[in-house]
Design a protein with these regions (language model features):
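Short N-terminal targeting/anchoring amphipathic segment
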Residues: 37-56, 65-67
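Active-site proximal beta-strand in glycosyltransferases
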Residues: 46-48, 60-86, 90
Length: 229
């Protein structure tokens, strides 16, 4: 796609070469492109940025009411990945990928309005991003109760548990559930855990399941519709 694109600009080249050396440039280039787009579009009432925390958000904030969504501070992801990574090569790659955090650490304290989904995240944002608590507004995640509601037609299966994992990284907390299954399986041999998510082949979750010897007690489901969930 890069080589086929005509009229490449600085962000295109920056994105391409930073990705080549193992970085994650999209946070920065997204902000630059958003700023360029909004410079000729003044009809918007406000702007919501979903955690890019790019330098351009400082400028956009001067032109529009800006709401900065931070689900959780990504320095925690880096912290956990480095903790569980094995080998200097893997750790070097992780540090390179998270290099955009230098930018986010500078931008976050300058945001006027930050939205967080929980008090726990709010506390972490203050801790890791050094943001004034008065700038952070907690708005809990919502759920569509027209879709996700009790279904009386489906009977409950004893000892069957369901959980979700949006990414195969220790931060998501699936480790604790898997270790709990390992403890409970002796007392409840029919226990079964269904994980809505996809583990990386040979990744952290697969290795832990193999180490605990609970393959027969855990299964994964992916690409489900809302109704199937």
């Amino acid at each position: 796609l890069f080589f086929n694109k005509k009229n490449k600009d600085f962000d295109d080249f920056y994105e391409f070469f930073i990705a080549l050396i193992g970085g994650f440039p999209e946070m920065r280039t997204f902000g630059n492109r958003a700023k360029k787009y909004l410079s000729t579009r003044k009809e918007y009432d406000f702007v919501i940025d979903n955690q890019s925390l790019s330098y351009s958000m400082i400028k956009i904030q001067e032109e529009f009411p800006l709401f900065q969504v931070i689900h959780h501070p990504i320095p925690r992801d880096k912290e956990y990945e480095l903790k569980y990574a094995k080998g200097i090569v893997k750790k070097t790659f992780i540090r390179s990928w998270y290099s955009f955090l230098k930018m986010q650490l500078k931008v976050a304290p300058k945001m006027h309005n930050i939205i967080s989904p929980s008090e726990s995240s709010k506390n972490d944002i203050q801790k890791y991003f050094h943001v004034d608590a008065n700038k952070i507004h907690v708005i809990p995640n919502g759920i569509d109760t027209e879709i996700f509601k009790p279904n009386l037609v489906i009977s409950k299966k004893p000892f069957k548990l369901i959980t979700t994992a949006s990414a195969d990284v220790p931060l998501k907390g699936l480790d604790f559930t898997l270790r709990a299954i390992n403890i409970a399986k002796d007392k409840y041999p029919l226990i079964n855990l269904v994980v809505i998510g996809k583990p990386r082949s040979g990744g952290h979750t697969e290795r832990l399941i193999s180490k605990l010897g609970i393959d027969e007690f855990v299964s994964f489901k992916t690409n489900l519709t809302n109704q199937e969930v």
